[in-house]
Amino acid sequence: MSHSSGIPASQELISAFGSANTGDVRLIKVVIKNDELVVDQKLNVQSDFETDLELAHSVLQKDSPCYILYKKDDKSIELTGYNWIFMFFVPDNAKVREKMTYAATRGNLKRELGASHFVDEIYSSNMNDFSKKGYQQHKLHQESEAPLTMEEQQRNDEKEQGLFVGGGGSGMHVHGISFPVDSDASTAVSNFINKKFNYIELSVNVDDEKIIFSSSSNIDIEAISSKISSTEPSFHFFRYSHQHEGENLDSIIYIYSCPDGSNGTKSAPVRKRMLFSSSKANVEQLVTSHNVKIDLKLEINSPSEISEESIINELHPPKVEEKKAFSKPSRPGRK
């Protein structure tokens, strides 16, 4: 499932960036307002590139994430206009929802303005990193870096996908958010593990930022789709007791549903989708932390994607008969 938020750049921002490529603008501060990327502030060139970096520091607010599009003095070889630095400030004390939304929107912003315009990127939760001294340290760090290991490259790839959320110094990466769990949700998980119910639904209270209980029951596999909302994201655990090839099985199925407007569904607000998406791994751990194995994980956008047949095919894929290879004749003189 994509971690992109889908929040677009406003026409005003696109025009402002285009004009700045040939004008006197040094930086453009960009924020998210009403589910749109908009210009919050513009400052003109005052001195040389490095000295003007103090301007970037001056537009930051200690509690508010933002992007800064910072124009360098050198022009692009391949494109019309100047080279730019993409800056992403996300303070530690910003709200979790803001962190996730800004992290997931970074890629959209670069793509809509043209990623090739940006020759360098700075991510940090520390305001002092957005200054002349901070930039010099950033360049020294780049020059001293050893070639990336495979694991480091993977983390960088995750950053490109929008998983960066800040967290001190030069930044950090997270794979999810760990919200507190409501007592009713904990009880529901225990009841599920102890086989009191074969189905439970959990959700996220977006206002309280907490994992909450939605429902529990004993149902047949055919009823799962009717339990899944076509308008709200949700998490579902189902124990599928069945026989396969003469063996009695209890398969645990974990479903994350996030309606996207397709197949008759209604897409949830962007911030809600991001909070649910970033919580799915931690919701899964509510069950797996009890040494319970998840046999099948499904991510869907519509209840219509779930059926008994689709679940069985995922759990027990039909065997494909392999064609018998032609035998090679024995070499002459061999028995």
Curated annotation (Swiss-Prot):
One of its GO terms (cellular component) is actin cytoskeleton. One of its GO terms (molecular function) is actin monomer binding. Keywords: Actin-binding, Cytoplasm, Cytoskeleton, Repeat. Coiled coil: none annotated. Residues 307-335 are annotated as: Disordered. InterPro entries: ADF-H (IPR002108), ADF-H/Gelsolin-like_dom_sf (IPR029006), Twinfilin (IPR028458). SUPFAM superfamilies: Actin depolymerizing proteins. The keyword Cytoplasm applies. Interacts with G-actin; ADP-actin form. Actin-binding protein involved in motile and morphological processes. Inhibits actin polymerization, likely by sequestering G-actin. Belongs to the actin-binding proteins ADF family. Twinfilin subfamily. This is Twinfilin. It comes from Dictyostelium discoideum. The lineage of its organism: Eukaryota, Amoebozoa, Evosea, Eumycetozoa, Dictyostelia.
